[in-house]
């Protein structure tokens, strides 16, 4: 996939560090995400990817470093304040309201974002995630892939400028993974995507740029082609897959 015309710097992470006791989860992470791109973050299990995403979304506060979003320092802002500025996150584990149907879940997310056009926006989101025909279905009637798609729908309900997708293809079979790939490809038309994903083949198909996180540090950040051929990345990660 070719890289789109360079957009403005949207997310700028500088020297972000986080420890849990004696365990270093983030060791001076530097990361830049530009508007309009799909930027993928890959790395082995335990590399610190989910910890980094939690810091970006505000669920964890870094020990040191700086996070800037759209030119403003958001390092100490709450998740709610970050969401109001246009930064949204989906989760590895679905956080769906099982007492509501599919449309009801999306409506709650739309209303939480302060939209006054709930019905219209719910319809738009369901179309985007491919669940229009399941709008009245209960959550337990959905497949694993459909539940993950709905989780993405909740994240984009507020029309964020940047959406953090934390391993959206985890636990999926081939067909469901390809449907999620198609969904992510659609998202790029109107939002920037930071994709954290273990499926490197999907990453190389989808991403404009790829960053590789190993032992809490970004060791490479470039085009998919450059990352795939990087000797250091092959030795530290890709050669062990």
Predicted regions and their residues:
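Glycine-rich phosphate-binding loops of nucleotide-dependent enzymes
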Residues: 2-241
């Amino acid at each position: 996939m070719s890289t789109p015309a360079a957009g403005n710097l949207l997310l700028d992470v500088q020297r972000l560090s986080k420890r849990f006791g004696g365990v270093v989860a983030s060791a001076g992470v530097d990361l830049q995400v530009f508007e309009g791109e799909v930027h993928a973050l890959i790395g082995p299990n335990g590399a610190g990817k989910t910890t980094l995403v939690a810091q970006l979304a505000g669920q964890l506060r870094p020990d040191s470093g700086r996070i800037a979003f759209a030119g403003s320092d958001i390092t100490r802002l709450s998740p709610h304040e970050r969401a109001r500025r246009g930064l949204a996150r989906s989760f590895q584990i679905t956080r769906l309201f099982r007492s509501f149907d599919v449309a009801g879940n999306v409506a709650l997310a739309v209303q939480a974002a302060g939209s006054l056009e709930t019905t219209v926006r719910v319809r738009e989101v369901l179309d985007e995630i491919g669940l229009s025909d399941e709008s009245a279905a209960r959550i337990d009637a959905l497949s694993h892939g459909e539940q993950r798609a709905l989780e993405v729908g909740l994240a984009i309900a507020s029309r964020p400028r940047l959406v953090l997708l934390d391993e959206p293809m985890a636990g999926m079979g081939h067909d469901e993974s390809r449907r999620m790939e198609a969904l992510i490809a659609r998202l790029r038309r109107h939002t920037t995507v930071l994709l954290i994903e273990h499926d490197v083949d999907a990453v190389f198909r989808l991403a404009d740029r790829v960053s590789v996180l190993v032992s809490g540090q970004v060791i490479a950040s470039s085009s998919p082609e450059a990352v795939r051929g990087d000797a250091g990345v092959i030795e530290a990660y890709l050669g062990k897959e």
